[in-house]
Structures are given as structure tokens and as C-alpha cells.
């Protein structure tokens, strides 16, 4: 199956259907009385760059390591809080761009034959219904080649509706938060947004309406009244993250799209999208029962529903991560976020979440969609040099459990099971080697080799001997987001040489050697990397017969914890 379809409009944001071109996104509700599109642009974030590096961490690193080795959990926790937590504690967070309202006045109780769908083959949201004897259609796309969101409206002659553009979260009803102004002209609405916080990006969003020959567009206040049997709404947006003048950037994008009619816009969009989507096909059975997707999820046992889910994941990958000028990878919510205060900042969590986003990329033959991840990684490597040097006295670069649009690599928040974990960047670096294994792109590998090398420099300096002097281990360490009871029954979080750390370090040192071999590099770090890899501890089986999560056979505080980080190497 290649469609998600429903017989009712979305009741909230979670039920709306997503479109995206990697940078611009919208959630389409499909309502008949008042249609709503929740807009996002991937560089609309609260606040600008900030230096949050804990300045006294290195001074207290020996004490922290000693407390961890002595299993003095309270002292380790105290030192981590006062010397290793960043100030301010939070990185920047992602925000909505705005909301488009289209007031049709079609009361739901008088609507018949309602159908709403996301066509995964064409990356198009379609809404159709009958109202008072007339048939109404809307089609929505997010075009990558033309940098535009487009809404096509088909209706009986003389149909009238009102278009508004504002900055409103239906989720929180926070009208006009960080909204500078909205102004309408004869056929366009322009909105300026300052997301808030010091040195934040500024955004410009332009909505333009074009009608069929008999149609009219009338400005009333900051609204546009459209009267036509066919109309096309184009939406463009840029921010100061990519354009010094976002008004000019958005206007240029709009001007380019005006050179294409509806058919050309749709054809260009579909051709581009299908060049990626059509690379693979998964079918697990014949087409399942012809029932709406929400009902199918509840009642169907047809394996084809799994194939649909797989196709949807590929659709989301293509729609949320594309190459371009200062491209950003997909964040915790892809590019779709309705909240001015999203969960976990809707940023880039790198103790598993960002990596998970890209697990389908190479195996689904969508390696190009992974490239924005490496654009961010290059910037992280630059900012991470200070993190490595100031916090740990190490060469190279390091990043902790999260990052943001500005590639912030300092510890984030004040939650011990996640905050003090400087191997987030190392895990991301393994994607370099995996990407090359699929693509065999030597130019890419050459570009990213210095990033990988910097990561290896950090790891070689960060590793210390264990108490026996036999093995090299990490300290401080955690098993991300998990905690334990030690052999005395005391609760702890910080540890030495968690299993996931050792697995990541071993994989990175091995990948570094393989990359150097592919590039013909005789790097001076190679001998040190080989020696360190040979001195890493082996994996250990617990008395219960399980792979240990920690170097010592500790007991999980929460058995069956959602993070199974010690299975990383699998």
C-alpha cells in the first residue's frame, strides 16, 4: 500500500498529514470549515550561538575520576553537578514558523464523501469532499527543486475563501509570540518572525495567491479573500541562518516558482521525489483490506500494513533531510513541530535519537539524505575542540548527549544519566564509515577523514588505565539514560568503561584504520590507535548469562530500560 487515508479531518496536530522538502514543512489538517496548515522552517530556532563550556571541569576531572573509581556515587554526583554541568544548562530549541488558515465555512455536518490522504508515491496530500452539491479538492506539496510549499484549490465557480497567515500554535494558543509583523498586499501576505533569545535567526515567510483567469484576490486588512474555481497558494520562507536578507531570499524563491504553472510545479516535484522514493519496493502481501488507515491499524493483521509503515518511513526521510546550503539533519521531530516549547527542545539528541533517524538511509538506498548529518558533524567538530580541551584536556574534539542548530557540544540539562557522556560525537562519527561502506565515495571519505581523525585524537587522550593497569577505559562514563545498583546496593549513574563506550571506541579506532587504508593515508595516529584498540577490555557475560551493561555486574534500577545501549555493537 502506498497511501495513508482517512474519512475524517484531523482533530489535532498528531492526526494531520506531513509534507516537507527537507527544509520547509507543513502539517495538513484537511478541515472543511477552516483548513489549517502548521508551518515549519528548519532553521527557526530560539536564540543564537552561546558558549556554555564548563570552565572548571578539567581542574576537577582527577577528583571526579577518583570518586567514580572508588564507587563514591554521591561525591561523583556532587562534583559533576558543580564542575561539569554547563551554564546555562539548556541548548537552543526549535520553534514553529507559523500557521496558514483557509476559511471555507463548510460545516462538517453538511459535508459528504470526505476523503483525506497522503500519497506516498507522489508526496502529495489530497483532500476531497462534497458540500451543498459541489465538489471541492485540495492538493498540497512541498517541492524540493523549487523551495516552495504549494496548495492547489479546486472548487465550483465563484467559491470564496479567506486566507490568513499568522504565528499561532493550535497546541498552545500562543498568539503572536515572537511575531514581528504581518502585512498583506494585493495577492500576497508577508510575515516577519523573530523567534526570541539573544542573536536568534530572523525569518521571513511569504504567501502568494494566484487565481484562474475568472478569479479574484482581494486584500481586506491582513487577509486575502479568494474567489475562484481554481487557485494556487505558494509559500516560501528563509531565515538569516542561510540569507543575510531573508526577505530577499524568500522573494527570490517565490519569483523563481512563478515561472512555472501548476502542472510544471507538480511534475518537477514528483520527478525529484520519485528519483529517490522509487529506488526500492517492498511488498509483503497483496493489497490489504480497503479500509481507512486509522481503522486498519486497530483491526488489520495484514502484513502489507508493515510495508506501508516502511514506505512511510522512507517518505519521512526524504521529506525531512535533503542536501542544500547549510543543510540541517532531521531533528527529534523530523522538521515538524507545533510547539514553542517542544519536548526536549526538538533538537538533535545524539545518544541514539539522531542516529536512529538515519538508520534507514543507506539500507533504503537514500544515502544522499544522510549528507545533512555530516554537514552538522563538521560544525560540531569545530565547536567540539573547545569542549575537548577545556573540559578534558584532550586533543581533537568531543560532543555530549545533544546538540542544536549551532552545533553546541557542551553538556546539556542537569540529568546525570545523560548529561556527562562525551561520546555522542564518536557515535556519530561511525556513520562516516557506514556511509562509505554503502556508497564507496572516496571524495566523501576524504572530506570527512579529518573529522574522524579529530574524534580519534580525543578518544586516545580521554582513555585512562583501569585500576589493574591492564585495560584502557573511559571515565567519566554512563550507559546513556540508565542507572544501576552497585554490588553494595547503592544507586549510581557515573561509572568507568560502560559497555557501550568500549564498543564505540573499538569501532571508531577500527574504522579510522580502515578509512586510512582506503585513502592510502600513513597517518601518525594509526600506531597509537592500534595499540589502544588492543588494550580495550573484552565484553563480559554476567552471572545471569547476559551481556553486562557496565564493567561491573551491576543491577539495573529499572529492569528492561528503554535504552539497551550495551547492544550497540549488534
Give the predicted meaning of each segment:
Residues 355, 427, 503:
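Active-site phosphate/pyrophosphate-handling residues
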Residues 1-417, 423, 434-436, 453, ...:
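Aromatic-residue-lined binding/catalytic grooves and analogous aromatic/hydrophobic interfacial grooves
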Residues 304-307, 446, 450, 503:
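A generic "alpha-helical surface" signal
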Residues 424-435, 444-461:
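Extended, hydrophobic alpha-helical segments in both membrane/secreted and soluble proteins
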Residues 454, 458-515:
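Acidic/histidine-rich catalytic neighborhood
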Amino acid at each position: 500500500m502506498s497511501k495513508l487515508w482517512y474519512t475524517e479531518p484531523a482533530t489535532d496536530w498528531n492526526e494531520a498529514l506531513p509534507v516537507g522538502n527537507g527544509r520547509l514543512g507543513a502539517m495538513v489538517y484537511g478541515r472543511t470549515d477552516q483548513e489549517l496548515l502548521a508551518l515549519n522552517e528548519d532553521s527557526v530556532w530560539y536564540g543564537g550561538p552561546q558558549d556554555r563550556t564548563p570552565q572548571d571541569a578539567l581542574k576537577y576531572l582527577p577528583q571526579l575520576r577518583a570518586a567514580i573509581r572508588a564507587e563514591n556515587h554521591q561525591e561523583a554526583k556532587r562534583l559533576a553537578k558543580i564542575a561539569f554541568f554547563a551554564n546555562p544548562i539548556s541548548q537552543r530549541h526549535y520553534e514553529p514558523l507559523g500557521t496558514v488558515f483557509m476559511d471555507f465555512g463548510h460545516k462538517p455536518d453538511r459535508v459528504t464523501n470526505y476523503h483525506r490522504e497522503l500519497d506516498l508515491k507522489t508526496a502529495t496530500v489530497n483532500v476531497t469532499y462534497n458540500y451543498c452539491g459541489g465538489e471541492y479538492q485540495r492538493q498540497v506539496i512541498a517541492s524540493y527543486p523549487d523551495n516552495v510549499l504549494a496548495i492547489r484549490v479546486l472548487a465550483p465557480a465563484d467559491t470564496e475563501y479567506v486566507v490568513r497567515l499568522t504565528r499561532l500554535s493550535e497546541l498552545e494558543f500562543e498568539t503572536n509570540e515572537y511575531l514581528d509583523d504581518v502585512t498583506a498586499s494585493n495577492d500576497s501576505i508577508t510575515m516577519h518572525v523573530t523567534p526570541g533569545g539573544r542573536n536568534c535567526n530572523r525569518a521571513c515567510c511569504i504567501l502568494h495567491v494566484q487565481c484562474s483567469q475568472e478569479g479574484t484576490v482581494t486584500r481586506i486588512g491582513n487577509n486575502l479573500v479568494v474567489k475562484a474555481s481554481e487557485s494556487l497558494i505558494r509559500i516560501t520562507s528563509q531565515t538569516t541562518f542561510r540569507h543575510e536578507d531573508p526577505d530577499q531570499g524568500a522573494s527570490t524563491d517565490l519569483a523563481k516558482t512563478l515561472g512555472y504553472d501548476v502542472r510544471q510545479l507538480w511534475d518537477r516535484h514528483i520527478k525529484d521525489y520519485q528519483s529517490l522514493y522509487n529506488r526500492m519496493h517492498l511488498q509483503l502481501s497483496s493489497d490489504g483490506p480497503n479500509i481507512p488507515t486509522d481503522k486498519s491499524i486497530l483491526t488489520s493483521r495484514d502484513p502489507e500494513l508493515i510495508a506501508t509503515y516502511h514506505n512511510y518511513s522512507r517518505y519521512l526521510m526524504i521529506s525531512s533531510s535533503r542536501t542544500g546550503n547549510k543543510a540541517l539533519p532531521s531533528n527529534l521531530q523530523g522538521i515538524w513541530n507545533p510547539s514553542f516549547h517542544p519536548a526536549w527542545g526538538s533538537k538533535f539528541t545524539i545518544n541514539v535519537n539522531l542516529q536512529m533517524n538515519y538508520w534507514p538511509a543507506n539500507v533504503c538506498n537514500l544515502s544522499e539524505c544522510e549528507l545533512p548529518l555530516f554537514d552538522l558533524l563538521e560544525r560540531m567538530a569545530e565547536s567540539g575542540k573547545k569542549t575537548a580541551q577545556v573540559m578534558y584536556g584532550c586533543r581533537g574534539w568531543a560532543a555530549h548527549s545533544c546538540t542544536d542548530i549551532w552545533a553546541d557540544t557542551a553538556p546539556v540539562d542537569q540529568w546525570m544519566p545523560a548529561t556527562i557522556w562525551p561520546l555522542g560525537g564518536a557515535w556519530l562519527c561511525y556513520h562516516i564509515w557506514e556511509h562509505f561502506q554503502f556508497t564507496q565515495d572516496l571524495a566523501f571519505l576524504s572530506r570527512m577523514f579529518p573529522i574522524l581523525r579529530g574524534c580519534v585524537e580525543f578518544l586516545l587522550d580521554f582513555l585512562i588505565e583501569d585500576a589493574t593497569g591492564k585495560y584502557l577505559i573511559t571515565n567519566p562514563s554512563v550507559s546513556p539514560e540508565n542507572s544501576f545498583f552497585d554490588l553494595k546496593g547503592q544507586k549510581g549513574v557515573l561509572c568507568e568503561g560502560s559497555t557501550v563506550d568500549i564498543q564505540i571506541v573499538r569501532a571508531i579506532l577500527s574504522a579510522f584504520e580502515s578509512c586510512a587504508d582506503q585513502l592510502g593515508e600513513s597517518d601518525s595516529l594509526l600506531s597509537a590507535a592500534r595499540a589502544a584498540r588492543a588494550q580495550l577490555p573484552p565484553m563480559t557475560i554476567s552471572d545471569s548469562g547476559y551481556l553486562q551493561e557496565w564493567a561491573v555486574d551491576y543491577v539495573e534500577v529499572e529492569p528492561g530500560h528503554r535504552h539497551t545501549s550495551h547492544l550497540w555493537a549488534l
